[in-house]
Curated annotation (Swiss-Prot):
Catalytic activity from the UniProt record: tRNA(Leu) + L-leucine + ATP = L-leucyl-tRNA(Leu) + AMP + diphosphate
Gene name as annotated: leuS
InterPro entries: aa-tRNA-synth_I_CS, aa-tRNA-synth_Ia, Leu-tRNA-ligase, Leu_tRNA-synth_edit, M/V/L/I-tRNA-synth_anticd-bd, Methionyl/Leucyl_tRNA_Synth, Rossmann-like_a/b/a_fold, tRNAsynth_Ia_anticodon-bd
Protein name, UniProt field: Leucine--tRNA ligase
The family this protein is said to belong to: Belongs to the class-I aminoacyl-tRNA synthetase family.
GO biological process: leucyl-tRNA aminoacylation
Source taxonomy: Bacteria, Pseudomonadati, Pseudomonadota, Alphaproteobacteria, Hyphomicrobiales
Keyword Membrane: no
Record EC number: 6.1.1.4
Motif 'HIGH' region, chain ranges: 43-53
Amino acid sequence: MDFERYNARETEPKWRDKWERSATFKTDNDDPRPKYYVLEMFPYPSGRIHMGHVRNYTMGDVIARYKRARGFSVLHPMGWDAFGMPAENAAMQNKSHPAAWTYANIEAMRAQLKSMGLSLDWSREIATCDPAYYRHQQKMFLDFLAAGLVDRKKSKVNWDPVDHTVLANEQVIDGRGWRSGALVEQRELTQWFFKITDYAEDLLRSLDGLTRWPEKVRLMQANWIGRSEGLLVRFALEPTLSAPATEIEVYTTRPDTLFGAKFLAIAADHPIAADCAKADPALAAFIAECRLRGTSVAAIETAEKKGVDTGLRVRHPFDENWLLPVYVANFVLMDYGTGAIFGCPAHDQRDLDFANAYGLGATPVILPPDADPKTFVIADKAYDGDGLLFHSRFLDGMTVEAAQEEVARRLEEHPLGNRPQAKRQVNFRLRDWGISRQRYWGCPIPIIHCPEHGAVPVPAKDLPVELPPDVSFDEPGNPLDRHPTWKHVNCPICAAPSLRETDTMDTFVDSSWYFARFTQPWMEDAPTDPSAIAKWLPVDQYIGGVEHAILHLLYARFFTRAMQATGHAGEIREPFAGLFTQGMVVHETYRSEAGDWMFPADVRIEIGPAGRRAFDLASGAEVSIGGIEKMSKSKRNTVDPDEIIGTFGADTARWFVLSDSPPERDVIWTEEGVQGAAKFVQRLWRLIGELIFLSGADGAPKPQSISPQAAAIRRAAHQSLIRLEEDLDRLRFNRAVAQAHDLANKLGAAVGDIDSVEIAPDLRFAFREAAEILTLMIAPMMPHLAEECWARLGHKGLAAEAPWPQADHSLVVEETIDLPVQVNGKKRGDLIIDRAAGREAIEAAALALEPVKRALEGRPVKKIIIVPQRIVNVVA
């Protein structure tokens, strides 16, 4: 049997055209079937998709196609996270407009995504830079503002003095702006905030209900929210003529360690620090130095611990004669707690590093189990474990928990001034979400600043506030600030000359509700349609990288709650019922003799006695092979999806990214692996052809009786189908691929066993059934090949519209079972016996096994334990 090779270049575009012309994947909101909403995190339109996109969107597409075949009405949309800084950078470099660059990239990437054969409903396509999208975002901003969920206040930011813009913590590298290289300054700017902290407790507690989220993501969010129960302690300042206050408030989660206190430290931007700096040039210089560092927790934690003694002293809460020095320290954050801490060096490594640097000492107050109180000291490593209190007066001998309670009780009862010296308090690490960005290419904040009425909302009838197209990027900073007319407007209340808000929204806002807009993207008079929200949300399966575990996912959870509170989300509070975080696509790195990174396409790999060696295709020079790393432009270890699809076809690329490793782990891209996937495509094509040839044009009717050979074929097909269903239901894509491989191997062997020209009807039926099952099994993963095979089988309709095959579970029940047999808990042999055998038959057969007889050595049997269809244990 000779068959023409499968030609992906000709076949794949043909089927994509048929899907598009027949609107196969267009979803009707009125479809009465049960719903299933699958969504991959939408891409930024950078201009090219990468192999990470291929893997991410292939996984989502497999789920969408599988659920559609199982009878669900599937919503599987696509859009573009289209605002952001790269477009402005491109505008500066290319003297173009961000909109032109963005929309050109969208066109290019849409064509690339379509070439993958994704079952997307393109009629719902959205771009966040489209005024038709962001007008609704502006409306929700105003609704949030009216509901008290938006605030305007001053905040510390990373300021790039060259680019004249605020930088995110991630954009500050070694204290410098990532693009300009300028030393970053800390500035205090007035900014807009979403009050996500109003939902801190709810966001934390609701994590327990997200049972279809990875545990690591829930833990990351819980840690980011950072709920802590502690004590707000008021330390009385020792009165002096220059003392700027009477007390310093400290929030602590470890009041049990108060007797180990050696100092108080306040943040550089604490009000008391500012007052002290007025008369202390050295302190003023130190505060200025602190403002030149990044504001991220990571930057502060890794920096050398430095401080300046203010000269102020506070009294210990339990001993007014015990004075503690007050330092301004570079590791204390003003926006956590009160901006002041007490340092217990013996039991906090950060405090110990600081104390050792300034000779403040360390007195341990928690005694580890089995430690000797007479000899236990702290040198360079703080003790942060459990134990009993010592060196702590009335707390000595108590557990940590009991000591915390006792300190809280005493200080709550002890007055300082006319108030208790301490009170219990719950704190959160989570901070309100600052959304102001000094950028042009973002959603304008719909506010007008009036000299009389302050910040005034833009009337709803005047939305959207659109970006002016006539801007220049010849100078650094925000072009909206320099625009001669756009920002000048009259106040909606009093008509006085006023100014528009020139900050735009953080692009995380755009991606915090797009999943809701997809449910009814044609809605013009409101952001969402209540009936569509009720039908489709929450998203049943959301797919994306774990790098978005905190910010994007947490912001989307907050936004859904805010939408619900303002009437835009019905009763929905959680946006994503199921979350899957896929691994990355990684590749070897290559470097030339000159040390330059090289693209894999420019390298030839040879395998010889000395192992794998790489050579430059152009010069023939040997190239050094580096480590396997995430594909990145900087190290040039990227593979162009267009080249792979153009050479091998989309199905080959899809098959490889699904097959190589568990989906939550990284997949190593190798040329050998891709070629192996391409060979399997050809093998499947030949196998389906052989099965069709052997079964005849129409197969044969289901026979009344069936031969063992035909029964084995049917059993293999239905068993693989059942296992593949289980794997796809659990998102085990690599194991689903393995099931298809396994069935192909078994069917190939069965075809090879045929040695007669005349094929019995039962075999023809079995071959035909197996061919159809195998075709529909691969359809979610290799949809183009499946369509061609489906048509080859004589079907007039599309495989994409065919119902999922019904597995016959009765076929996969073996007539015999294999039972391990133990003697006194140690396995001695295996018993193959009829599945329907009774207890007496199993006991007799087990005792008749020669290994069991030898193990018993003539000893009498006390009892025989039988776990039905699992195991037999003979006790002697």
